[in-house]
Amino acid sequence: PDLEGSLMVELVLINMARLEQAYPPLILRFDDLSGQQVAARRLSAAEYLPRSLSADRPMPVDKAVSIKLAILDPGERALSYSVSVEQ
């Protein structure tokens, strides 16, 4: 990313259900070498969707949605990350 001290997280969401549904909240988590959480953040659809998509519209079926997030670097202790869909 253009900002010093930031990271770019890129992911693709695909709605594998048989019907359109709301874009889910995402949980972005960073862990240290021992698997302990260093940082985490819950992101609403309005926060992560690109400007070309609206959180007010449903997520289409079987369509890839590319997401790019510029976030602050959680520090050198954060050695791995995961993204999960909030249930």
Specify the residue positions occupied by each region the protein language model found:
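Low-complexity, acidic Ser/Thr/Pro/Gly-rich terminal tails and inter-domain linkers that flank the onset
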Residues: 1-3
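Generic short beta-strand
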Residues: 11, 27-28
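Short, surface-exposed ligand- or partner-binding patches at beta-edge/loop junctions that are enriched
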Residues: 70-87
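Short acidic/proline- and small/hydrophobic-mixed sequence motifs that coincide with surface turns
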Residues: 20-23, 38, 78
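Conserved aromatic beta-strand anchor motif in extracellular beta-sandwich/beta-rich domains
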Residues: 28-32, 85
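Intrinsically disordered, low-complexity Pro/Gly/Ser/Thr-rich segments with frequent PxxP/GP/PP motifs
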Residues: 33-75
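Asparagine-centered strand-capping/turn motif at beta-strand->loop junctions
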Residues: 13-18
